[in-house]
UniProtKB/Swiss-Prot annotation:
It catalyses: a ubiquinone + NADH + 5 H(+)(in) = a ubiquinol + NAD(+) + 4 H(+)(out). The chain crosses the membrane at residues 1-21, 27-47, 48-68, 87-107, 138-158. GO terms for cellular component: mitochondrial membrane. This is NADH-ubiquinone oxidoreductase chain 6.
Amino acid sequence: MTYFVLFLGLCFVLGGLAVASNPSPYYGVVGLVLASVAGCAWLLSLGVSFVSLVLFMVYLGGMLVVFVYSVSLAADPFPEAWGDWRVVGYGMGFVAVLVMGMVVGGFECWDLGVVTVDSVGMFSVRLDFGGVAMFYSCGVGMFLVAGWGLLLTLFVVLELVRGLTRGAIRAV
């Protein structure tokens, strides 16, 4: 089980690398889906089922809408692939920064191990269900702030993707 959890963590990092070094929006969607599926499966394997489901619905429901809209506006007949030398260079740079951070920061994190949600002791309420109560009691203000931030991010992305054209309001 430990190897499976560490494999999911590796898939999560590789998905994030694919999103960060995408040459075109087509491949960014693939990296986002890989990272969200791996991250939610990682949480699911650790026993946090509700938070995993909520994050999966938010990632695939919200972020893919933005990617689909940007793909439709940035239609490129010949998109660059991940095999291009610039993209491979970016990927190697990210891996070099990761290795350098591990060398400079030390390898203390290797001794931590993988701990599931109920493995520490006797709990009366699972940690993810306690988090659900926090979502609906104290988290209302944070949800409003997060929703406003996501709406602002949507408009910023739409404005950046639109460029100099008028988008859907162009003259017929």
